[in-house]
Design a protein with these regions (language model features):
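Conserved N-terminal segment of class I S-adenosyl-L-methionine
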Residues: 1-75, 79-83, 96, 159-160, ...
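Conserved phosphate-binding and hydrolysis motifs of nucleotide-dependent enzymes
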Residues: 28, 106-107
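Flexible, glycine-rich phosphate/dinucleotide-binding loops
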Residues: 33, 52, 118-119, 186-189, ...
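Intrinsically disordered, low-complexity segments enriched in proline/serine/threonine
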Residues: 73, 116, 130, 233-235, ...
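Short catalytic micro-motifs in class I SAM-dependent methyltransferases
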Residues: 84-88
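S-adenosyl-L-methionine-dependent methyltransferase catalytic module, highlighting the catalytic core
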Residues: 90-99, 108-227
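Intrinsic disorder/low-complexity segments
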Residues: 232-254
């Protein structure tokens, strides 16, 4: 995931270089941020967990609320970041529409989430929550997993937050896709590295899964990252271009 974070960091750095300041919303902010913004940025975080907000020392402003329903001020932010949150929402399309109306022209929406159609995504969606907690404690090594304010949290993995759903959202709302890339996440990498037998079985089963699912299930790509840009007013005046024109779209999954 470091590569994907670096790609987003470069996009943010380019914005910082061209502007005197940035207003940034960390949606579902938790207690930390993956991206560095520096002194030019005013950071606002929203989360449903008071414990997570209390532990986050990077924010200038904290909002206790649900990103699906909280009335975010219109045209208010240059950057909206939503990382590993959409999968936990029963109505992710509500959050996406909330981001759309609060982002300024020329601003970006950064999304990171599991691939719904991956083996990890399907296993996460259809296995009990207690199993997720056990994996976080035993495999990742987080003894606080599942306690109040700590993940893993309940997941829904709705189709609206799949890479295909995000592409559709971008096209329908005239957003440019600056980046859309799928990759193998830390959890699966850790399990395969820590348990060689699991890795052996995975390597044997993965090709069969791809064939039997007609390519719709992606064993190796578990997560994706997307950067959607709201066109500036002058861009809207020019002749309309395809949503993918001049963008980086790599290794995407359905």
């Amino acid at each position: 995931m470091d590569k994907q974070i670096q790609m987003v960091q470069q996009i943010v750095d380019d914005m910082l270089a061209k502007r005197e300041s940035l207003r940034v919303l960390e949606a579902g902010c938790g207690s930390r941020s993956f991206i560095q913004f520096g002194p030019k940025a005013y950071l606002v975080g929203i989360d449903i967990s008071a414990e997570q907000l209390q532990k986050n020392n990077l924010l200038q402003e904290k909002i206790l609320g649900d990103i699906q329903e909280f009335p975010l001020q219109a045209v208010n932010f240059d950057v909206v970041i939503c990382w590993d949150v959409l999968e936990h929402l029963p109505q992710p399309e509500m959050a996406l529409n909330n981001f759309l109306q609060t982002i300024k022209p020329g601003g970006i929406i950064v999304l990171g989430a599991p691939v719904v159609s991956s083996l990890k995504g399907l296993a996460t969606k259809y296995t009990p929550h207690w199993l997720h907690v056990m994996l976080y404690r035993k495999v990742i090594g987080n003894p606080l997993a599942g306690t109040p304010g700590y993940g893993p949290f309940k997941t829904f993995l709705k189709s609206a937050m799949s890479p295909k759903g995000i592409r559709r959202f971008a096209v329908e709302n005239h957003l440019r896709i600056d980046l859309l890339e799928s990759f193998e996440g830390v959890m699966q990498q850790t399990v395969r590295r820590k348990y060689p037998l699991v890795d052996l079985v995975f390597r044997a089963v993965a090709p069969l899964v791809r064939v039997l699912s007609f390519g719709t299930v992606t064993p190796h790509t578990t997560d994706f990252i997307a950067v959607l840009r709201k066109p500036a007013p002058d861009a809207r005046d020019r002749q309309a271009e395809p949503a993918f024109a001049g963008t980086t779209v790599l290794n995407t999954a359905h």
